[in-house]
Amino acid sequence: MVGALCGCWFRLGGARPLIPLGPTVVQTSMSRSQVALLGLSLLLMLLLYVGLPGPPEQTSCLWGDPNVTVLAGLTPGNSPIFYREVLPLNQAHRVEVVLLHGKAFNSHTWEQLGTLQLLSQRGYRAVALDLPGFGNSAPSKEASTEAGRAALLERALRDLEVQNAVLVSPSLSGHYALPFLMRGHHQLHGFVPIAPTSTQNYTQEQFWAVKTPTLILYGELDHILARESLRQLRHLPNHSVVKLRNAGHACYLHKPQDFHLVLLAFLDHLP
């Protein structure tokens, strides 16, 4: 079944935080005349935006609560992993969201996008990791093998006391997420691959064996990696597919609001 929602096309098929990084409070004060002028300006901008093609959505505007405190730290032991974490502001959901990243990004991406803050506001604990050699995580020899990458991710989740993970895996992070999925999918409550790498390393039968609820997400303008990964990921028996319109490979950057809507809908409907 195919449908459309907010510009998206969809198909249905331990270590503890160490360093506080916030919160940030933004305050505004305007007169009535300024508010009226601002409203008129926004209306004109909206009309121009609708009528003309434009750049990707601004990613610096937080969609979640700017008062959320983002914590950070390092996991213990060998090959420590740097992480950013938010705790639920309201009544906590059972699942916890673990955010990986692509080649050009790191855990800070999810803070800049407002994803961490939004998940906290919606009652989710969320942890964003810096993969080895990225951000504040040092390179690791363990990451040179498939088994080592799976073990590294499993250890990070254990050290962070993540019990019911929903793993969000864009692009390069597929090198870590897919080996972990194949070996430890019973530990995952959900899986959100975003045009991940390494799908070609596994057979149809291996994908069929994974029963984890999966949201396959990709950008309409990603004509290479998204299509390659989709061919294999479709073999996951419990999946849905969402295509973000007018978005490229890093679709969560190009369409952050659509991405957040789709992600929250998936999380909110997990058992």
Curated annotation (Swiss-Prot):
Tell me what topology the record assigns in the membrane: Single-pass type II membrane protein
Instruction: Report the active site residues.
Output: 171 (charge relay system), 222 (charge relay system), 249 (charge relay system)
GO molecular-function term, one example from the UniProt record: hydrolase activity
A Pfam family reported for this protein in Swiss-Prot or TrEMBL: Abhydrolase_6
Q: Does the keyword rRNA processing apply?
A: no
Q: Name one GO cellular component term.
A: cytoplasm
What subcellular compartments does it reside in? Cytoplasm; Membrane
Gene3D superfamilies given in the database record? alpha/beta hydrolase
UniProtKB keywords: Cytoplasm, Glycoprotein, Hydrolase, Membrane, Signal-anchor, Transmembrane, Transmembrane helix
Q: What is its main location?
A: cytoplasm
EC code(s) of this entry: 3.-.-.-
Role according to the record: Possible role in granule neuron development.
User: Which family does this protein fall into?
Assistant: Belongs to the AB hydrolase superfamily. ABHD14 family.
Which PANTHER family does this one have?
Answer: PROTEIN ABHD14A, PROTEIN ABHD14B-LIKE
What's this protein's name?
A: Protein ABHD14A
Where does this protein come from, organism-wise?
A: Homo sapiens (Human)
